[in-house]
Amino acid sequence: MLRFLSKNSVAAIRNVSIARGVHTKATLPPLPYAYNALEPALSETIMKLHHDKHHQTYVNNLNAAQEKLADPNLDLEGEVALQAAIKFNGGGHINHSLFWKILAPQKEGGGKPVTSGSLHKAITSKWGSLEDFQKEMNAALASIQGSGWAWLIVDKDGSLRITTTANQDTIVKSKPIIGIDAWEHAYYPQYENRKAEYFKAIWNVINWKEAESRYSNR
C-alpha cells in the first residue's frame, strides 16, 4: 500500500497502476475442507459466518477501496483517506487466507504435531515442550485487548518468536508460521465469552503439516 507521498508521487504511481490495468481484484479463497470438518473445535455455523460473511466483507471492501484508488481524479486527501481502508481490509484478507490454511480436520492430521519435523524441534528447543509453547501462545492471545491476532513467526535470522498484532495488521519483515484469530467473530457465536476455551480448542485443528512446510520454506 501507498505511504504518505507527495501529490506528484501519488499521481505517478496511480498512472502506472492504471496503465497496468489497475489492480487484480481480490477473491475469497475456498475453504480447503467442508464447513463442518473442524467440529467440534469450530462449528459449521461459525465457519460459514467467518468465511462467507466476515472474510467476504474484507474482500469486498478491499476491492471497493482499490477501485476508488484508481480514479485519476482522486486528490491527495482522498488517497490518504483510502489508505486506512486498504490496510484494514487488505490485512483482513491476507490474515484470513493464511488462517484457513493453518487449520485442518483431525482426520487429515489437524492437531497432530509432526514430531520429526524441523519446526517441532525448533519449538521444543526454545520453549522446552510443545505444551509450554501452546501455553505461551494462549497467554499472548489472552493479552490482546479488543481485536487482533497472535502469531508464531520466524525472523530473518531463523529464530522463532511469538507476537501479536492489533485489528487486521499483518506481519511484515518476518514470516508468519501460525496465526490465530482473536477477534470475537472467530469464536463468540460458539463459545460466547468463554474465549479461553476457544484458545484451547483450536489447537485440536492446527495444521502442523502446513506450519512445518511454511517453516521449512522460509
Swiss-Prot record:
Known EC number: 1.15.1.1
Top enzyme class: oxidoreductase
InterPro entries associated with the record: Fe/Mn_Superoxide_Dismutase (IPR050265), Mn/Fe_SOD (IPR001189), Mn/Fe_SOD_BS (IPR019833), Mn/Fe_SOD_C (IPR019832), Mn/Fe_SOD_N (IPR019831), Mn/Fe_SOD_N_sf (IPR036324), SOD_C_sf (IPR036314)
A Gene Ontology BP annotation from the UniProt entry: removal of superoxide radicals
Coiled-coil residues: none
Compartments where located: Mitochondrion matrix
Entry keywords, A to Z: Antioxidant, Manganese, Metal-binding, Mitochondrion, Oxidoreductase, Phosphoprotein, Transit peptide
Reaction(s) catalysed (UniProt annotation): 2 superoxide + 2 H(+) = H2O2 + O2
Family: Belongs to the iron/manganese superoxide dismutase family.
Function text: Destroys superoxide anion radicals which are normally produced within the cells and which are toxic to biological systems.
Protein name from the UniProt record: Superoxide dismutase [Mn], mitochondrial
Organism: Schizosaccharomyces pombe (strain 972 / ATCC 24843) (Fission yeast)
